[in-house]
Amino acid sequence: MKVKQQLKQLKPYQPGKPIEEVKREYQLETVIKLASNENPYGCSPLVRQAVMNELDDLALYPDGYSRTLREALAAHIGISEKQLIFGNGSDEVVQIICRAFLQKGTNTVMATPTFPQYRHNAIIEGAEVREIPLQDGHHHLEAMLEAIDDHTRVVWICSPNNPTGTYVNDASLRAFLNKVPQHVLVVVDEAYYEYVQAEDYPNTVSLLQQYENMMILRTFSKAYGLAALRIGYGIAHEHLLQAIEPAREPFNTSRLAQAAAFAALKDQTFIQQCAQKNKQGLDQFYAFCDEYGLRYYKSEGNFILIDFGFSGDEVFTYLLQRGIIVRSGCALGFPTAVRITVGSAEQNETIIRALTNMLKERRDSFCKETF
């Protein structure tokens, strides 16, 4: 048996260690996971009852059109119901786009480092991947434009970008879209949209009226706290979605996910509270970094990338031994950094305390070695 040649250059996704495994390995009673950009406050209390109401119908297929959720979400965003496509997480919408647009002989343009699933799915489809290094943590849009040619089919903009948390502002995005050829789809991935505080962040939905070659991705996994249920969506012109719908699997979002997302959407107070707490949490980390002279990017997401100036794996291991799970930057293209999900105020205090102790221990060790 022979699998696709391009699969041989890919590795399957490696999830972090489960909390229970970390407890056993390090003999810990409590473990804080701040590695996957999940919502530390969970989801809206409305979700639990919505899921419970679906349990008697688990033998029935879900609504393949997601009509109830579709109507509510379209009204919430202010668009037509036909401008939405749903996926088993926004990851699946990325997969659908790659399946629909990319093949051998085409290419796709993206930043690096960024969300890895753009590259992963493009390679599976046999497309050439053109990666443009970030410029001081931000998308280098001019260089991305220069990488586009007649064979380019999709350009990816992750804003806020994972793992840096930086964003593309309104003026920059408009200028970029004005120069992108009409045959190229521009995908703006807004997985962390609900956390954004920047005043010059673009109203991407309104831009769809002017740029028909644009698609927006959002998710219920982050601020809405439904990561376990896997549901995300794309927003675009009706004719674009009609063209790619055949690449979507039928019944790709479960009835539990649809019901949970519908309920979560009703509770915008919860979302606003989470966004405000996240802002306060980022301020905790900014203050810590400023005190110790650590480099970081101002983040519009629910995470922060901090450069410690030495191996991110070392920081990761130090914290793991103390019951705190973060993401080493070595796996993200930033070998001297770690990415930390913003937790509750108490969780943030715990990790900042641990990081402070780590820096003091390294300083004391350095002083002894140089004495």
Swiss-Prot record:
Pathway: Amino-acid biosynthesis; L-histidine biosynthesis; L-histidine from 5-phospho-alpha-D-ribose 1-diphosphate: step 7/9. One of its GO terms (biological process) is L-histidine biosynthetic process. InterPro entries: Aminotrans_II_pyridoxalP_BS, Aminotransferase_I/II_large, HisP_aminotrans, HistidinolP_aminotransfase, PyrdxlP-dep_Trfase, PyrdxlP-dep_Trfase_major, PyrdxlP-dep_Trfase_small. It catalyses: L-histidinol phosphate + 2-oxoglutarate = 3-(imidazol-4-yl)-2-oxopropyl phosphate + L-glutamate. Its cofactor is pyridoxal 5'-phosphate. Its EC number is 2.6.1.9. PANTHER family: HISTIDINOL-PHOSPHATE AMINOTRANSFERASE (PTHR43643:SF3), HISTIDINOL-PHOSPHATE AMINOTRANSFERASE 2 (PTHR43643). Homodimer. Belongs to the class-II pyridoxal-phosphate-dependent aminotransferase family. Histidinol-phosphate aminotransferase subfamily. This is Histidinol-phosphate aminotransferase. It comes from Anoxybacillus flavithermus (strain DSM 21510 / WK1).
